[in-house]
From Swiss-Prot:
Its main location: cytoplasm. This is Leucyl/phenylalanyl-tRNA--protein transferase. It comes from the Bacteria. InterPro entries: Acyl_CoA_acyltransferase, Leu/Phe-tRNA_Trfase, Leu/Phe-tRNA_Trfase_C, Leu/Phe-tRNA_Trfase_N. Belongs to the L/F-transferase family. One of its GO terms (cellular component) is cytoplasm. Pfam families: Leu_Phe_trans. Functions in the N-end rule pathway of protein degradation where it conjugates Leu, Phe and, less efficiently, Met from aminoacyl-tRNAs to the N-termini of proteins containing an N-terminal arginine or lysine. The gene is aat. Its EC number is 2.3.2.6. PANTHER family: LEUCYL/PHENYLALANYL-TRNA--PROTEIN TRANSFERASE, LEUCYL_PHENYLALANYL-TRNA--PROTEIN TRANSFERASE.
Amino acid sequence: MRLVQLSRHSIAFPSPEGALREPNGLLALGGDLSPARLLMAYQHGIFPWFSPGDPILWWSPDPRAVLWPEEFHLSRSMKRFHNTSPYRVTLNYAFDRVIDGCTNHRDEGTWITRGIEEAYRRLHELGHAHSIEVWRDQELVGGMYGVSQGALFCGESMFSRKENASKTALLVFCAEFIHHGGKLIDCQVLNSHTASLGAIEIPRCDYLEHLSRLRQQPLVSRFWVPRTLFLPRK
């Protein structure tokens, strides 16, 4: 297996089955972050992930981390918090602010480069990338964003400035996603946070089968229209 150099003149990707085992899932480098190339990548289970100063790197890890939304793990403490939550949750109200929050909230640095920000803003303008916002009064305290593929949602990043804000974003999104025909959330690579919320690892081949099937299944009409998803308990 060898790393493939992408051409700027073609948006085609090599098969994910050719990805390196170490580092796990590294498939290709180069190309660009145009909407057409990004959408082609997501349609084939591939995503960009690289640090500032590095070339664009494309990944398709094996195994793949996913969350079946009905399997979201609601801990006792989170259930108590949610029952008296002070938060309001919205959909697609403030995409730019959410991606800024994901970029700037990590003290150790971030993989979300200026180029990544601009690329996903373009995807949002085209109706493919979406945000979930969590508010305390008028303050944005958390959120997440990702890319839609029919009944599958590819989560990209989340942030939290207040207690349980990012968990609230995912909890409320899972409930709405299920209600409107959503089936699976792609978490890309498992970490302790997503594992605590119910994410698991499945073989890449299984993920690609789910992706091929689910991206052909539309959600209920107008699901992504900007709106309020959750109001705080009184």
